[in-house]
Amino acid sequence: MGKLLTKVLANRMQFDAAAYSLLHDGQCGGVRKHATIDAGIVLLDFINTSRERGWHTSVCAIDVAQFFPSLNHAAVTRVLAKLGFAKTLTNLMASYFIDRQTVYRWDSATSDPFDFSFGTPQGDCLSPIISALFLSVAIKHVFPPSLTPKSTRCLFFVNDGALYTASPSLATNVRVLSAHLLSLLIALANIGLAIELSKTELIHFFAFQLSASSQSLARTHQPSLTFRWNDEDFVIKPSNVWRYLGFFFTPTLDWTYHVHYYTNKGFSSVRACSMLGNSIRGIGPKQRALGYQACILPVLTYGSALWHAPQGVGVIKHVKHMERVHSFAMGWITGTFRTTPIGARGVIAGIPPLCIILDLRFCGYQVRLTTLDDRHICRTTWSHRWINPRIRDVRPRTRPRHLPSDNPLERLATDAVREQFFPFHASSRPGDRLLDLFPHRISIDAYSPKKGSTLFKAWLSDLAKSITLLHSSTRTIIYSDGAYWNKTARGAYSFTVFRDNRWQDFFGWCPAGSSFDAEIVAIEEAVQWACIQNINDPIFFINNKAALSSFLDTRVRPSQMATIRISEILKDRLINSRSSFSFRYCPSHSGIDGNDHADRLTKRGTALAPVTPPRLLLSDFINDYTKRMTIHWRVLFTSRSFKGQQWLPIRRQKKVFKPAVRNKASTNFFFELSGNDIVLLSRMARAITNHAPTGDYRRRFLPDLEQHCPACPQHAQTRTHVLFHCSRYSPLHTSLTNWCHDRNNSKLWKTFFQRNTTAFTFGDLPDDVH
């Protein structure tokens, strides 16, 4: 219960701190909706904006020593009270930190308990937000918030800080940083904190030579940072490589070191995965693909938003270097040879090429930027681009037009999303959400057994009986439905009402980027109608589980404003009446008359939509980007140099298989075809690419070895011979041409490998090769 209570308090304090701007703009750690990449982007924006106009940038990195254990409890409570938190909360914090004890255990030996009533527990839910609020006092004293940003600023991620400034001279930068560093040391000392001066670092970023004809850097002498503190002189020498929050910066902003570091780290991780299995044993290929995408890709692509550009323009050398890790991982997942084309391996594993993965992550950060609050440091940096008046009229030295900007914020900014988001709306505040206020007057039942199971049939029968009883009662029953047609990009909603033994129909079109968006609109329209009509205790049947589970979730997500409107409408109704609302799941196309009728109304609503509906929503942006990436992958797949010269056209659902991005059916096709068996998948992959232990493979790569079939010495052991003519195996089909045109050739393919367990294995090799 104690941990649950601290989590509740932490969520409330995080929300209030962000909603009321209680923290310094430069604080990115321990704060909701902030990440390390935010700090990196803001810093790079400052560096690029300055150096394009001929100003050098200098950064001083600091580390607050013993941060969590050094927080003074009395000072913490005073800070919370000063910031406006309730007295009950400050009193709770004061009592929460006292009378704490801890013990140390070494094997079976346990120490006596001793007092631990100082600082904040580092793993506690409250520690990040309390420490951030406490530290903000000192930061605001040295870097006070103002409408006009200063030439010298700071960033803090928990206790890792960075002071940065820009000017025409590095010597000026050093003097300014020294003065601000001393001011910060004094401010931190006043609240009982100190900087670990031995970890202080300095780095200079060179500006462009504005007088040069080409984009060249003005490399100049790099002075050291000197200051005096506690009667001791300190000299901080500039570094050639600076690591901050996992990003590696150099004075020239060359990302080679960063990319090489994470490529090596990813390579070490993926090579260690060999302990989990190889081509004949170990975990299944589906689990391998999941592990690679969950554990290794995030490491390999960490910080890619800082340097990557769409389609890899201008950074191809970095992408090529990282592809070595991706290629090795695809071979481990599929059990194929090193000579197998990497494109074919990725298609079989259901994982796109690395260039597409980087583009998708780039898109993901674009999406994140559009959903941030207007007061977020990334949004304010972009919306209110402040340039020092001394260099405002200087023509920036930018990259050639055919190359993307050096500034990641300019690359990431997009105006394609016009949907509005409100991260800190009052209805999103923990404790003030609709289900927090009226938990017993709103009923949501999204349960249903798995479709096709015996339990589902019994459950559906009981649901139909309960609906029949409801129809004979006096309650108002509302069936809602929404639909989105991907090909035409049209969305429609409908709801039908059974009331007083008669039906009332409502339908129309709506902007939508997915079925989820349309379903949320349908629920909103139905709820609004019920409240306007003063319906008491209505019951809603909804055929979309995702919409049913989240239509009152007002967090940032697609259709957030619609969920906020639903919450506000219901809140007003519940405050002014004693009515209750019930929402239940009803599967579509299951023989429920009201649900089927709503589905027909939705199709009528589609006819009202314009020929080219507006595409302004977040879902539209994500769908369009995903489609472009799918097209890109399929264009690559048509190239023989990508998938190999001898790829076989296997079919899925009677159509020639084509890869698709974020499509489960396409991603899992080869895993399901092989039954998630690594031995079977590796044999299939070798055969479909013709990179298998056969005589044909030896002819191309090992010409000195035997190339004839062991079972048929008069014939060369080619893939066609093994599949269709070898006397050792039952044939796949009458001929390769007939198999390629067979609409169910994937089933024949699977049957062949299940019956012929040694086909395309090393067991087929002649004796002189073993």
Locate predicted features.
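Catalytic palm active-site di-aspartate
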Residues: 26-30, 57-67, 93, 119-123, ...
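Helix/loop segments that flank and initiate small ligand/metal-binding modules
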Residues: 95, 465-472, 479, 483-487, ...
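Basic, alpha-helical interaction scaffolds
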Residues: 231-308
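RNase H catalytic domain
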Residues: 161, 306-319, 483, 523-600, ...
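Family-specific functional microsites
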Residues: 569-577, 671-770
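Short, conserved micro-motifs composed of acidic
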Residues: 108, 194-240
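RNase H-like nuclease fold core
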Residues: 456-521, 525-536, 552
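Conserved pre-catalytic core of RNA-dependent polymerases
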Residues: 1-129, 133, 166
